[in-house]
Amino acid sequence: MRVFFRATLAALTVALAVPLQAQERVLNLYNWADYVGADALQRFQKETGIRVKYDTFDSAEVLDSKLMTGRSGYDVVFPASSGLARAIQAKAVQPVDDGQLKNVANLDPELLAKLATIDPGNRFGVPYTWGTVGLAINKDAVLKRIPDAPLDSLDLLFKPEYAGRLADCGISLIDSPQEVISVALNYLGKSPYSTEPADLAQVRELLAKLQPNVRYIASGKHINDLANGSLCVALTYTGDALMGAAQAKQANKPFEVIYRIPKEGTLIWFDTMAIPVDAPHPQEARAFIDFMLRPESIAELTNTLYFANANQKATPLLNADVAGDPDIYPPAAMRQKLFGEQLLTLKQQRDRTRLWSAFRTRS
């Protein structure tokens, strides 16, 4: 789901080399670049003898197209929860059949329930990573301009008295109408998936007030801009924000980039593992999914990219600064304020896209 630095490696295809044999077992993965731990892939291959071919995509739309067209040749794909919902609706994925997954019990029931808003019964998708949409903030730049800035509130974006004082140092938003509009509706006290014209009109007005203060709307670019100090606030995804923060720290920048989950609540997103309906090697696919449900397999990824995982038994294997960060693993009170994705009809999606296009054109 998330579009960040790894997308620049989208042309990469990695085939882990093993000798070709007559009855060779093969697994074809389709994922973002660098979105599986290298050690985990090597362990899987060594343990099972299955040769792994790892192809990458650089946008969710590319993956959607592959799934909807069919005959992709892939065995495991990694759609965001919104993409999984569309694939389920189009009958483009097959049931995972968790009866064959002995490690599925490691998954957090509360998170499974949130994913079930688009995959009832969790039949078609297995949570891989998860996170939130929130505020990436250059703390020093913001507090210099607004000493009493509400760093944990979307007021920072949506109230002109704050956003207007930050325009000179840069505000950006992810280019994702469904997600941003849902977050805006929730901020206004409406249902995040309201289709009422009056509610969408309020969102239109809210975004119109923000528009003069927005530097750009794009996904991915903000990571480097946060790291080098070219932005002071971005509405973005957990991992993207924390990647920018880590880059700034590693470069010894004279400022701190932080991530905050808005106190008003926000969207929880998932990247999932799913099996295309016509996957050529479905049993190998299930073997891989079960392998990634082992705590050590997914902990490697979380420690590297700062994306939370849904594996309860992986927590003891996480770095303390990751597991203890309330903006990566929020406490129970905040988790209650997180809303899952919901599939809208094509007309409802078009209504939101038109609203967003008008806002984006003016920005």
Which role does the model predict for each range below?
Residues 200-209, 215, 253-274:
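Periplasmic-binding protein-like
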Residues 83-86, 233-254:
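A ligand-binding cleft/hinge motif common to bilobed small-molecule-binding domains
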Residues 94-105, 155, 251-267, 276-278:
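Short beta-strand->loop
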Residues 276-337:
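Mature extracytoplasmic/periplasmic domains
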Residues 136-141, 186-187, 269-281, 300:
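A bilobed periplasmic-binding-protein/Venus flytrap-type ligand-binding module shared by bacterial periplasmic
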Residues 224, 332-363:
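Conserved C-terminal helix/tail region of periplasmic/extracytoplasmic solute-binding proteins
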Residues 81-213, 218-227, 244:
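Extracytoplasmic ligand-binding site segments that recognize negatively charged/polar headgroups
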